[in-house]
Every structure is written in structure tokens, then in C-alpha cells.
Amino acid sequence: MNAIQISWVLAAEDSARLATFYSELFQATLKPGLAEHHCIVQFSDGTQLEIYQPSRRRPFPARGKALAPCLRLSPSQEPLPELQRLLSNALQRGGSLLEEARLEPFGAEAWIQDPEGNPLLLLAPLESVAPTS
């Protein structure tokens, strides 16, 4: 299981508005994300900023703590088991769980902290909804 992409994720109350702000400010490409409330800003160097409205199942991140790296796995028909394997590996190596892995309409996700306490989103997209490059 290899990660295919690392990007940044930014929680927003209005993801479309914030994505438009960043794409226009940096003359970057605005792409649709995995869901209606998810947008991807693609910069000229290939870096991506994924702007999303958090699930109602989790609290909105505190201001100033809404930006985190996202480790996106290869799309899968069975994203939750893929994510759980990576999560188990991360915990064995000193990471800690912030939020349990859960299945969402776009795939599976879990929030962890690295050994120094930095937040990290682990994302396993559902193969049928994975965005194309």
C-alpha cells in the first residue's frame, strides 16, 4: 500500500468561496473535489490545497488549526480496510489517534497525530469517486 499523493487540507465554512479566493489569488487551477463541499486548488508546481467543509460528525477545527497535511492513498473499492491497515502501522510507529477511522460517501478517513503531535489526515478515496488529474 503506497500513498500516491500528499496535499494540504483546509477546513472552511464556505469551501467554494475560499477555494475561489486561493485559486484567483495565486492564479491556480480550481478543480472539483470528492464531494459538493470539497474543492481542489492545484498550483503550477503540482501542489494541491484541498478545501472542504468538515463532516457534521466531527467538530469544526479551531481557527488557526484548520490546515493539515493529507496523505491520500490509492483509490480503492474497499477504502476502510486499506485505511485501517495504514492507521495500525502509524499507531505502531508512535502516532496517536485523534479520530477513529470512518467511512464517508467519498471513501474512508481518519485523523491522527504524528509522534510530535502534528495533525495528519489519512484519506482512502472510494475508487468510483476519485478525482481525475
Kindly give the residue locations of the regions a language model identified.
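Short, charge-rich, low-complexity interaction segments located
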Residues: 58-62, 131-132
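N-terminal beta-strand motif that seeds the catalytic metal site of vicinal oxygen chelate
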Residues: 1-20, 69-73, 126-133
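Short amphipathic alpha-helices in soluble, non-transmembrane regions
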Residues: 23-25, 85-90
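Domain-length accessory/inserted modules outside core catalytic folds
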Residues: 15, 47-49, 55, 62-66, ...
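Short, conserved charged micro-motifs
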Residues: 16-18, 77-85
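Core segments of cupin and vicinal oxygen chelate
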Residues: 2, 9-49, 56
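Vicinal oxygen chelate
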Residues: 7, 87-133
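Short coil/loop residues immediately preceding or within conserved phosphate-binding loops
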Residues: 36, 68, 107
